[in-house]
Amino acid sequence: MSSFVTNGYLPVTLEPHELTLDIKTNIRNAVYKTYLHREISGKMAKKIEIREDVELPLGEIVNNSVVINVPCVITYAYYHVGDIVRGTLNIEDESNVTIQCGDLICKLSRDSGTVSFSDSKYCFFRNGNAYDNGSEVTAVLMEAQQGIESSFVFLANIVDS
């Protein structure tokens, strides 16, 4: 995983009932709820600091809500194709084999190996190696996929040890 820090403006939408004396708290909560630990366009905000030293730009009324661009210092994380990651093998059935690596989900394609059921548990076989469901494996990221909520998603292949 790689990361970088940038200054930017994050747009958030506030409802009329949120425009009270607690507006700073409501803005902070809206920024965190909308952007923190959410995968958007291949990157995820891991840390957000709202800049108090910069004036807040005027809001814009859109569909009975107020859109505010909030000045922030944002630390983003992202993954590259070719990165090598380590995680837990999760086999739900023959067609759903993934590796869970914290904020990253690696999907294994059918041609990555074969799944069999033995001794009341699933096993994944690749190049003569057997990997039990729940075992720690290493994988190389092959292709980025559409992320889900708070996780990156990549197609990956297991690296034989």
Curated annotation (Swiss-Prot):
This is DNA-directed RNA polymerase 18 kDa subunit. The keyword Transcription applies. Belongs to the poxviridae DNA-directed RNA polymerase 18 kDa subunit family. InterPro entries: DNA-dir_RNA_pol_18kDa_poxviral. The DNA-dependent RNA polymerase used for intermediate and late genes expression consists of eight subunits Rpo30/OPG66, Rpo7/OPG90, Rpo22/OPG103, Rpo147/OPG105, Rpo18/OPG119, Rpo19/OPG131, Rpo132/OPG151 and Rpo35/OPG156. The same holoenzyme, with the addition of the transcription-specificity factor OPG109, is used for early gene expression. Keywords: DNA-directed RNA polymerase, Early protein, Nucleotidyltransferase, Transcription, Transferase, Virion. Induction: Expressed in the early phase of the viral replicative cycle. It is found in: Virion.
